[in-house]
UniProtKB/Swiss-Prot annotation:
Domain of life assignment: Bacteria
Subcellular location field: Cellular thylakoid membrane
The keyword rRNA processing is annotated on this UniProt entry: no
Modified residues (N-formylmethionine): 1
Membrane topology: Single-pass membrane protein
Name used for this protein in its record: Photosystem II reaction center protein M
Pfam families xref list: PsbM (PF05151)
Gene disruption phenotype: Decreased yields of PSII dimers with increased PSII monomers, slightly slower photoautotrophic growth, about 20% less oxygen evolution. Formed PSII dimers are less stable than wild-type.
Lumenal side: 1-6
Stated role: One of the components of the core complex of photosystem II (PSII). PSII is a light-driven water:plastoquinone oxidoreductase that uses light energy to abstract electrons from H(2)O, generating O(2) and a proton gradient subsequently used for ATP formation. It consists of a core antenna complex that captures photons, and an electron transfer chain that converts photonic excitation into a charge separation. This subunit is found at the monomer-monomer interface.
Organism: Thermosynechococcus vestitus (strain NIES-2133 / IAM M-273 / BP-1)
Cofactor binding description: PSII binds multiple chlorophylls, carotenoids and specific lipids.
Gene assigned in the entry: psbM
């Protein structure tokens, strides 16, 4: 089975981008709760 490199990159981005976005939101809410 040939691995389509473009498909692999697209899948990695599709998984990583929302994960990073959620982590950033989580860290922001955590820091806001600690400061208040």
């Amino acid at each position: 089975m040939e691995v389509n490199q473009l498909g692999l990159i697209a899948t990695a981005l599709f998984v990583l981008v929302p994960s990073v976005f959620l982590i950033i939101l989580y860290v922001q809410t955590e820091s806001q709760q600690k400061s208040s």
